[in-house]
């Protein structure tokens, strides 16, 4: 029997102005509470979605995000609480922007591919340059075209970096080390990647031949959807010290942001795992509230196979972003007739938005080894954390938050408070407010392109029809999302970037 909206509200408590609690009983079998972070405008969206669901209206066939956060709180082995970040929106199984951690010592604890997502290690990399907006404006169109020519974009796009089957096997195992060996990356790029660009538990044998077949031609390609390469300008510096450590010292400095993932390969790894896990659930009698939350015990063969395959797909995504960095450096050096080195095109940082990782965290005063699922959320470790690079030991880990086409992006830093409240996790971007289908119905792609042109943004798009799905109107306001995290203390604002050119699939 479904409850009325007013009945549902009995299970929701406001903890403080940026955080709500979802009490046990909101959905059946909750082992821990849920929480979600919002500010006033975002809160309205969340409750509106719940109200619509109570009336029988869904969002693209998914449950409302609040219900999804609750269902995750019912998964075996979850600790502390199921957490929704301010950009949370309905997704497959887990909401996108929902993170959860599972106790590795608990033999029943599970891993769920829906808690990582289909685009494994979809993530963002930020490069700096020593160019100014004044240097780029006169050649902006030329530069956008040069990037578009260098980086293969679009749904079925094929890579330009030569790769045979043996190369792919090695790339899946080695991640950025492969790019380094092949001359597509600089040694210091690796230092500035989450996991140093290589997940060591990766096993290419756990990636099906179908997945490899999909991945082989796509390496070094941008893909479609919300993936982009963007030329950006520093618009605001909130923390001078952190910005300087990142090599950003003034407004108007030019940066490049690359947002992409594991393409068809990661999608296939997730699909294969879901099939295997449905069987494992029957065998081990694991029950879940929503069949999209298919999962397997971490210690089971299916659980281990998925984690090894996921790590390989993660490595593929890091190689992919490295390849695109190589192509971006080439494009810039061609337009400015100088070397990428002379342009100071260093990687500030590279973060993952969709991944599950084994980490040490304090839970109820005890140190525990946890499998942390981050889907549409970003690791944000505090200063002095052993897993972040030397350069950022005093600032905290840089967190890259991509806006949507034509809106600002942000660089944040991790905090100690985030470590205790959210397992060192913060938001990842704007988060959808309209489903893709709805965006296509409501928006006209020419209007979207014209609006970008009016804002002085050069744009190159491989599939204009997909532009509406990515229009700023389809998303929550990224500034609301970032400010919520900042005010809640789970990450702090360092830099704001605005786009001057966008290359999209």
From Swiss-Prot:
Protein name: RNA-splicing ligase RtcB homolog
Pfam families named among the record's database cross-references: RtcB
Cofactor info, note text: Binds 2 manganese ions per subunit.
InterPro entries: RtcB, RtcB-like_sf, RtcB_euk
Gene Ontology annotations for the cellular component aspect, listed alphabetically: cytoplasm; nucleus; tRNA-splicing ligase complex
Gene Ontology BP, a term: tRNA splicing, via endonucleolytic cleavage and ligation
Record's miscellaneous remark: Ligation probably proceeds through 3 nucleotidyl transfer steps, with 2',3'-cyclic phosphate termini being hydrolyzed to 3'-P termini in a step that precedes 3'-P activation with GMP. In the first nucleotidyl transfer step, RTCB reacts with GTP to form a covalent RTCB-histidine-GMP intermediate with release of PPi; in the second step, the GMP moiety is transferred to the RNA 3'-P; in the third step, the 5'-OH from the opposite RNA strand attacks the activated 3'-P to form a 3',5'-phosphodiester bond and release GMP.
Classification via PROSITE patterns: UPF0027
Organism: Danio rerio (Zebrafish)
Binding site for GMP: 226-230, 353-354, 402-405, 409, 428-431, 504
Family affiliation: Belongs to the RtcB family.
Reactions mediated catalytically: a 3'-end 3'-phospho-ribonucleotide-RNA + a 5'-end dephospho-ribonucleoside-RNA + GTP = a ribonucleotidyl-ribonucleotide-RNA + GMP + diphosphate; a 3'-end 2',3'-cyclophospho-ribonucleotide-RNA + a 5'-end dephospho-ribonucleoside-RNA + GTP + H2O = a ribonucleotidyl-ribonucleotide-RNA + GMP + diphosphate + H(+)
Positions bound to Mn(2+) 1: 119, 122, 227
């Amino acid at each position: 029997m479904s409850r009325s909206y007013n009945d549902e509200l009995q299970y929701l408590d406001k903890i403080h102005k940026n955080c709500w609690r979802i009490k046990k009983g909101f959905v059946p079998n909750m082992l821990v509470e849920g929480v979600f972070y919002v500010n006033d405008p975002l809160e309205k969206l969340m409750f509106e979605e719940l109200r619509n669901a109570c009336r029988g209206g869904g969002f693209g066939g998914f449950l409302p995000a609040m219900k999804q956060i609750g269902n995750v709180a019912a998964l075996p082995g979850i600790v502390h609480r199921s957490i929704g970040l301010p950009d949370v929106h309905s997704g497959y199984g887990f909401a996108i922007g929902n993170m959860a951690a599972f106790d590795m010592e608990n033999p029943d604890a599970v891993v769920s591919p829906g808690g990582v997502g289909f685009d494994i290690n979809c993530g963002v990399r930020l490069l700096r340059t020593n160019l100014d907006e004044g240097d780029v404006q006169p050649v902006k169109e030329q530069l956008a075209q040069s990037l578009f020519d260098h980086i293969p974009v679009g749904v079925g796009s094929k890579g330009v970096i030569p790769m045979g089957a043996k190369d792919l096997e090695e790339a899946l195992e080695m991640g950025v080390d492969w790019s380094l060996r092949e001359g597509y990356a600089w040694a210091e790029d690796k230092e500035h990647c989450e996991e140093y660009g290589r997940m060591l538990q990766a096993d290419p044998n756990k990636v099906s031949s179908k997945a490899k077949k999909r991945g082989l031609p796509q390496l070094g390609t941008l893909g479609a959807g919300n993936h982009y390469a963007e030329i950006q300008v520093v618009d605001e510096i909130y923390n001078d010290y952190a910005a300087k450590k990142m090599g950003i010292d003034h407004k108007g400095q030019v940066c490049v942001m690359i947002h992409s993932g594991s393409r068809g390969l990661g999608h296939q790894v997730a699909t294969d795992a879901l099939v295997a896990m449905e069987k494992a659930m029957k065998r081990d009698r694991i029950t879940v509230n929503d069949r999209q939350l298919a999962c397997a015990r971490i210690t089971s063969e299916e659980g281990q196979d998925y984690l090894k395959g996921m790590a390989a797909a993660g490595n593929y995504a890091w190689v992919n972003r490295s390849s695109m960095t190589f192509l971006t450096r080439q494009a810039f050096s061609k337009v400015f007739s100088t070397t990428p080195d002379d342009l100071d095109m260093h990687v500030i940082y590279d973060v993952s938005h969709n991944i599950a990782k084994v980490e040490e965290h304090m839970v109820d005063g005890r140190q525990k080894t946890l499998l942390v699922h981050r889907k549409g959320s970003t690791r944000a470790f505090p200063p002095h954390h052993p897993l972040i690079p030397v350069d950022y030991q005093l600032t905290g880990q840089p967190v890259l938050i991509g806006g949507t086409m034509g809106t600002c992006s942000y660089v944040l830093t991790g905090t100690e408070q985030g470590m205790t409240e959210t397992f060192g996790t913060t938001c990842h971007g704007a988060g959808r407010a309209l489903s893709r289908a709805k965006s296509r119905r409501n928006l006209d792609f020419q209007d979207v392109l014209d609006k970008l042109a009016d804002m002085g943004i050069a744009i190159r798009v491989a599939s204009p029809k997909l532009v509406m799905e990515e229009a700023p109107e389809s998303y929550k306001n990224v500034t609301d999302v970032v400010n919520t995290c900042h005010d809640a203390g789970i990450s702090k604002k360092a830099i704001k970037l605005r786009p001057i050119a966008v290359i999209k699939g």
